[in-house]
Amino acid sequence: MSSPQRPLSVAVLGAGHVGTVLARLAVAAGHDVRLATTRDARELALIADFLVPGVTATSIPEATKGADLVIAAVPLHRYRTLDREALAGHAVIDLLNYWAGTDGKIEEFEVPETSSEVIADFLDGARTVKTLNHIGYHEMESDHRPAGDPERRAVALAGNDEDAKAVVSRFLDEIGFDPVDAGDLAAGAAYQPGTPIFNGSFDAAQMRAELEKAAQVPVPQNA
């Protein structure tokens, strides 16, 4: 019989709606969660104790030190405030979206590459995984379900590092969603804003079918 996996050390960067919801889900799943923003850690602790009981509020360098997973939950226009040195080598969830109609035209994202590829180029040494961008924060809180639940929702993920995707897949599963691997980071184009996946809710089989339609290639059944 295999021994239980140890809890993940999860650093959540950002204390907005998305960051606090994911921190709560991670705490509920039994993980060691550290929350950090650019504000003073003592000031953040006052907010964190109320919004996310069980989380540790700290500085960004301390939050990311030794973390198994980092969640970049900052607004897109602030992605360049992410500490590249602190994130180097880490599995990093990018859940940011580029909405030209909402954010206005941002020239660096007006390119053939996906927003995640642009962000991954900036982060350089980080192992970026695109996920959780096609589900709203309120749905994260309301739609998570235990494994095997027939109403469990699927979440797509894409990245170039298989080990990072394995960590992210475990995290998604343990907070209540079925992870479906879309492929490399560029495959995240299949669930950017304006796509059927971005605008819909799917179980794992349906998600694989949608990804196959988008990519015109088979998605592994164990994804």
Task: Annotate each PLM feature.
Residues 21, 25, 122, 171:
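Rossmann-fold NAD(P)-dependent oxidoreductase module
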Residues 84-89, 122-124, 147-149:
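Short, conserved loop/helix-junction motifs that constitute active-site signature segments
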Residues 96-146:
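Rossmann-fold NAD(P)-binding glycine/threonine-rich loop
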Residues 1-49:
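NAD(P)+-binding Rossmann beta1-loop-alpha1 motif at the extreme N-terminus of oxidoreductases
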Residues 52-103:
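Rossmann-like NAD(P)-binding element
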Residues 150-223:
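Active-site-lining helix/loop region of Rossmann-like oxidoreductase modules
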Residues 57, 127-131, 180-182:
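General beta-strand structural signal in soluble alpha/beta enzymes
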